[in-house]
Amino acid sequence: MSTVITSIDPHSPAERAGITVGEQLLEINGHHIVDVLDYRFYGYDPVAVLRLAKDGQERTVTVRKEEGRDLGLNFPTYLMDEMHQCANHCLFCFVDQMPPHMRPSLYIKDDDERLSFLLGNYTTLTNLSEREAQRIIDLHISPINVSVHATDPQLHCTLLGNKGAERSLEYIRRFCQAGIVMNGQIVVCPGWNDGDQLRRTLRDLTEWQFSSCSLVPVGITKYRKGLARLRPVEKDCAREIITIAEEFGQENLRRYGTRRFFCADELFLRAGLPLPEEDYYEGYRQIENGVGMLRSLEQEFLSAMKLEEPDAAPSPFTIATGTAAAPFMTHLLEQARAYFPALRGQVIAVENDFIGHTIDVA
């Protein structure tokens, strides 16, 4: 933990209050400051009383500002603490399937609830302490993005490669009861958490009133030597996943007004099924997980296209994309050609020789 101030934003409330670099932030409004969540939450109010220390001397400074405005303090790290590293050994971990000799940041496995809230990273909650869990409830830290994968405790532990992973399911239940908004994901691995196990997971999440959850197919690269044997989601499996998700989605729509469960675009592409209409995505609440990216792109593309004159003749172009998205991009190009008769362009599907042909999205 490091709450020593390293810099202060110019013209910020903290600068106006006379706070100086090198002081350590101990408390805000009587609350002990451990990390960035404490700093953000307790520093939100228009009046912030800061207890500071430097060279063995303490002082109190009152900062007045607009509600919600940042105090303007900066610390050695973004989190003001060490990042929580992943303690799991997931059967499907994509980082474990990376090629060697890449840049170091590609091999970092974070599993930090603070990064989930602040940056949208996904967390399994398996390394969450009781204090951290209770803080999420007490401060109503929401939304957070949670990797669920399965609600059968034994299967959950197996998929995450962590004998103690069951406690994360208890955290999920507690957070649901406390009204914490959670966006979840299920990485579907054929033969593991599909079929009846998937039904159980969706049934449990419905019962717990989990906010929303995306279903995505497992990604398998050509670098799986020494790892658990997995098989990709193929056409029939993708169709079954979509059918199960739709069954529970329709039930949730009838009972709660939200479908709750959303299938990634990649599943529809693998299933050979048309993408859902825009209202399926409920405002694209799971778009960061590949749910609705193509439909959103199409809507934005068509809207932008109609702002141009039909006789426009842009320079010739080529769109390079993965093999999965190539048919859809070709579909967009055909719509553009119908509107711009002089348009000259092509779509090129690129095989992923680098990490494996089974990684075909772009």
Give the positions of each predicted feature:
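Flexible glycine/acidic-rich beta-alpha junction loops that bind and position SAM and/or redox cofactors
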Residues: 192, 209-236, 256-278, 352-359
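Hard-cation-handling environments
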Residues: 239-321, 339
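Conserved PDZ fold ligand-binding element
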Residues: 16-34
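Redox- and metal-dependent alpha/beta enzyme cores, enriched for Fe-S-associated oxidoreductases
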Residues: 307-362
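Short, Lys/Arg- and Gly-enriched loop/turn segments at beta-strand edges
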Residues: 31-39, 59-61
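Terminal peptide-recognition signature
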Residues: 14, 22-25, 50, 93
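Conserved Radical SAM active-site core
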Residues: 56-58, 67-208, 219-248
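Short, compositionally biased
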Residues: 37-51, 66-68
